[in-house]
């Protein structure tokens, strides 16, 4: 209702007894119909909050989730502790990871990549909105289209299994950003293999049931990993480093 009337919740509360005009009723009913058909509200409104900031979103990018905030916060701690300067964000989507990092790390050099040109355009628009200057954007399938290395590679890649049951609302999001293959972990495993000689650290969000396959893939690639949980207590990601890279203890 607030969105349909273009007013704040506080103003809506003060106008509870006001009668809607026919135009306002029509707008509200159209909004309800779109929601009933499974269109995410974030696509209707065109915005979504992430780490306290309002990012532009549309049907070409995934809707940011709170789980990814955990990934960004953990990476920020590592980057600051290790004084890393070169960062790569794989599958940037709307740019939430790269931009959130750039705003906290103005001296870092960040490369944000995505396979989707439409997603990259959205990320560029968000970077412009926040006045971020230290991000470059590139179309790439994982690490295949460039040779640049990084101190840390960060990714929230597609990791859902092809046959996993999803709500209509989620199915309205781009499949390119949702599904990681038949099992769901194929893209993650491929990324780990590609990152082996390209970074000191690799940090990824993963599916709740993918810890075992990630442990195997990371070990085979020479990474030593720590896994972390989301707010619901499920395994949700890992922070890995090449074993011969010396950690700085804070």
What are these regions (language model features)?
Residues 80-81, 86, 242-250:
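Short, basic, low-complexity termini and linkers enriched in Ser/Thr/Gly/Pro
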Residues 159-187:
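Mobile active-site "lid"/loop adjacent to the S-adenosyl-L-methionine
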Residues 67-163:
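Conserved SAM/SAH cofactor-binding pocket of Class I
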Residues 45, 139-140, 206, 229:
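Short loop/edge segments at beta-strand edges and connector loops
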Residues 55, 135-137, 225:
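Generic structural signal for residues in well-ordered beta-strands
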Residues 182-241:
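Conserved Class I SAM-dependent methyltransferase catalytic core
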Residues 2-77:
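Conserved AdoMet
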